């Protein structure tokens, strides 16, 4: 056998083992299915707190329900055995509602009972809920209390996860004489287990079929790509119905950490209350955290002082001296005092946001993926970050650029065990995106010589001018959104004229229109002639968005 050059071996070893050497528990396990994972965690992390849930009594008294991994595993089993008793085992069960402990129990119980779970977006309109229930062929719906009136007329089994009926099902399963039947349920690793609808209008949403191997593979790859500890506390803010929200929760459970929920938008209060160490959120929420900190700094007249401190700490870090968390302790204390990592999902993050958190000693990373890839394809980690990129492919994933242009930009295609089974009952649509074992993402990007991926935008959004030149709207929007006077924008074309709609930030202090005008002149100076903005309009109303916060084009 031909020996690999030493330099190649070194690169390979660094990619796959650096995180493991730093981790106390350095042997992560690749689980065959989720039941194996939960049962293993119930033993390994038996008395660890899996979920800490705030409860408000009738007298207004606050208490906390600390649910251990052992209890969590038992309650999943009890609900799954209740499904056997009620004829729901092996069936399709939908769940809708805010992030909650009960939501996760329903999700896993449906899977453990040999069925298919159908997570529904809680931002859907009534007719969209009805449509997706019909398309998924769900026979039961578990819902949060806020949906009680909205789902009352649906002719399927309905259970409110916040009513006594749900807790009665746990008791029913516990007392049922069907333990052997439950234990004998065969868990398939490669059959459809999760049916997820992509965001968009009802007519455009696609039902994505995922198997357990898709999820456990992505979990495992992420667990060896970044450092996660059983002592971590995760604030589960990203919606569970979103693939990344679902996968990262399963990932964090596999690592034995504690998971907590945020009430409303009181993020800073919750982070302080629970001692949150890891926070996963959409870009807008992370950006608002940064803006809130900057607003306090400005009000205290400390802007120049902080900027100088950041320059000093960055210089020291280059010399191997990291004093960021000590130097910016007051800022970190304002976010609970223990925050060590911010993970940004669902959309691309502003470079300013990533730079801010990393400058104060909180690791801020982002990745790239789709519902169809369970979802992570690439990600940054503590030692692999590069400006404007979405990181390297996570272990076990391949990616390449299809039909690149003169700038190396083309469609990103990927291959790995995280790739979906297909679109439910849409074989022709599936064949359009899965070819010869490769998934065609519909995203345009490039990959540099070191393997870092850079996203330019969606293939369907690209503007092709009459001279044959391509303009990528998202690329220009990233530059435009750097202005503090601009909240959001959308770039589009009318003929060969590149235009832009801008939403001004109402909290901007100063003349927003003048600031925007100056910034747009700067933007055009940075762009090649055919990409320049010919005209723009400023509006007060926000753009229409999907439930994951992406602007609808």
What residues fall within each predicted segment?
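Conserved C-terminal "lid"/linker of ANL adenylate-forming enzymes
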Residues: 488-490, 521-553
């Amino acid at each position: 056998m031909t020996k690999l050059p030493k330099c190649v071996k070194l690169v390979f070893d660094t990619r796959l083992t650096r995180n493991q050497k730093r981790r106390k528990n350095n042997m992560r396990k690749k689980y065959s299915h989720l039941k194996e994972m939960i049962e293993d965690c119930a033993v390994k992390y038996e008395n660890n707190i899996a979920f800490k849930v705030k409860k408000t009594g009738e007298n207004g008294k606050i208490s906390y329900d600390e649910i251990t991994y052992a209890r969590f595993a038992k309650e999943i089993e009890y609900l799954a055995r209740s499904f056997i008793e009620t004829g729901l085992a092996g069936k399709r069960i939908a769940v809708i509602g805010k992030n909650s402990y009960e939501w996760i129990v329903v999700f896993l119980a449906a899977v453990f009972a040999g069925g298919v779970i159908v997570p529904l977006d809680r931002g859907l309109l009534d007719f969209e809920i009805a449509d997706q229930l019909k398309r998924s062929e769900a026979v039961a719906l578990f819902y949060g209390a806020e949906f009680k009136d909205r789902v009352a007329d649906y002719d399927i089994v309905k259970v409110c996860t916040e009513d006594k009926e749900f807790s009665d099902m746990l008791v029913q399963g516990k007392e049922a004489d069907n333990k052997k039947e439950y234990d004998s349920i065969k868990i398939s690793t490669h059959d459809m287990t999760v049916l997820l609808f992509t965001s968009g209008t009802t007519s455009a949403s696609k039902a994505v079929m995922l198997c357990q191997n898709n999820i456990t593979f992505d979990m495992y790859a992420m667990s060896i790509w970044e450092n996660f500890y059983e002592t971590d506390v995760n604030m589960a803010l990203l919606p569970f119905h979103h693939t990344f929200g679902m996968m990262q929760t399963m990932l964090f459970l596999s690592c034995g950490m504690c998971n907590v929920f945020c009430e409303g938008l009181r993020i800073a209060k919750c982070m302080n209350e629970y001692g949150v160490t890891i926070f996963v959120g959409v870009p807008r929420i992370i950006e608002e955290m940064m803006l809130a900190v900057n607003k306090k700094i400005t009000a205290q007249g400390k802007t120049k002082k902080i900027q100088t401190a950041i320059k000093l700490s960055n210089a020291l870090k280059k010399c191997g001296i990291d004093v960021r968390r000590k130097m910016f302790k007051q800022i970190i204390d304002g976010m609970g005092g223990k925050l060590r990592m911010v993970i940004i999902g669902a959309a691309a993050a502003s470079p300013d946001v990533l730079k801010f958190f990393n400058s104060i000693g909180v690791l801020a990373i982002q990745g790239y993926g789709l519902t169809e890839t369970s979802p992570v394809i690439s990600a940054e980690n503590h030692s692999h970050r590069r400006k404007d990129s979405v990181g390297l492919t996570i272990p076990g994933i391949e990616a390449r650029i299809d039909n690149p242009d003169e700038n190396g930009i083309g469609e990103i295609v990927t291959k790995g065990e995280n790739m979906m089974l297909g679109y439910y009952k849409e074989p022709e649509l599936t064949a359009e995106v899965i070819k010869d074992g490769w998934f065609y993402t519909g995203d345009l990007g490039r990959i540099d010589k070191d393997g870092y991926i850079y996203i330019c935008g969606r293939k369907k959004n690209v503007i092709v001018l009459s001279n044959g030149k391509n303009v990528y709207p998202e690329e220009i929007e990233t530059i435009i959104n750097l202005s503090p006077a601009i909240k959001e924008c959308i770039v589009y074309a009318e003929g060969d004229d590149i235009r832009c709609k801008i939403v001004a930030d109402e909290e901007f202090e100063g003349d927003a229109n003048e600031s925007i005008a100056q910034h747009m002149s700067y933007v055009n100076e940075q762009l090649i002639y055919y990409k320049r903005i010919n005209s723009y309009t400023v509006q007060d109303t926000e753009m229409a968005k999907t439930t994951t916060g992406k602007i609808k084009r």
